[in-house]
Design a protein with these regions (language model features):
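Iron-sulfur cluster-binding cysteine motifs and their immediate structural context
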Residues: 174, 179, 183-206, 210-227
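FMN-binding flavodoxin-like domain, especially the glycine-rich phosphate-binding loop
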Residues: 2-17, 21-169, 224-250
Length: 250
């Protein structure tokens, strides 16, 4: 059996949970579509794919689905995972499960995982070691169910899906201590950062804050009063930790 983790994960949070599950089931291979679309690939029934993507406004980020779209299954078992920043995952897990089914995969289980939110100080450090251990145990249980003949699970959510799946509205800016090393420019999922490493195209930026998280000199960030006010209130509203939710076919 070949095991894969197929992920879109700008700050690495969605990747952690999906990778924990995939690696628990065997020697896993990472298919990271954060910076570019997946190459066309067809998987067999003997393979297993763990999909991982972030929740944006209660939906899977639309760009993640676009980049995962070249992957196709042939009755290939998969686990669908979405990661959200402690507010809610709404219709995202249902949406990702539908997406997988439409492309020939058989979702055997799904999970809504809590991760550190992009904005403010919300669930900092998640997923924790305990979260990842839960992920690994869930993957093993899901695989046992599949081998026992259980198929299909019912993720929560509604059709039609709620509005969402787009980027946020807070565009980072660049401080004067920027060294123009090019890391943020080369690592931007949407190619929104200019050649000068300081200018950011607001029409392309999805507010994933990958540049903010990765800048070695902390020159990227949102420094406006509007953002600071929002982040403080949002962090207070979501301070109580939520638990990961796992869905099996029984």
């Amino acid at each position: 059996m070949a095991v894969y983790a197929a992920v879109f994960s700008p700050t690495g949070t969605s990747r952690k949970g999906a990778w924990a599950m995939a690696s628990a089931l065997g020697e896993a291979r990472l298919l990271d579509v954060t910076l570019s679309p997946a190459a066309a690939q067809v998987f067999s029934r003997e393979d297993l794919v763990v999909f991982g993507a972030p929740v944006y406004g209660g939906r899977v980020f639309a760009g993640a689905l676009e980049r995962l779209s070249p992957l196709r299954g042939q009755e290939t078992p998969c686990i669908a995972t979405v990661t959200y920043g402690n507010r809610d995952f709404d219709d995202a897990l249902l949406e990702l499960t539908d997406f997988c089914r439409e492309r020939g995969f058989v979702p055997l289980a799904g999970a809504a995982l809590v991760g550190e939110h992009t904005y403010g100080s919300i669930q900092v450090g998640r997923p924790t070691a305990e979260d990842l251990e839960q992920d690994r145990a869930f993957a093993l249980e899901a695989w046992d169910d599949w081998n026992a003949g259980w198929e299909g699970f019912s993720p929560p959510g509604n059709r039609p899906y709620r509005e969402g799946g787009k980027g946020g509205s807070f565009v980072p800016s660049t401080l004067e201590n920027c060294t123009r090393c090019g890391l943020c420019r080369d690592q931007c999922p949407m190619g929104a950062i200019g050649e000068d490493c300081t200018s950011i195209d607001s029409s392309r930026c999805i507010s994933c804050f990958r540049c903010v998280k990765r800048c070695p000199v902390k020159a990227k960030g949102c420094f406006t009063p509007e953002y600071e006010s929002f982040a403080q209130a949002f962090s207070q509203r979501l301070k109580e930790p939520r638990e990961n939710q796992y869905f099996l076919p029984r």
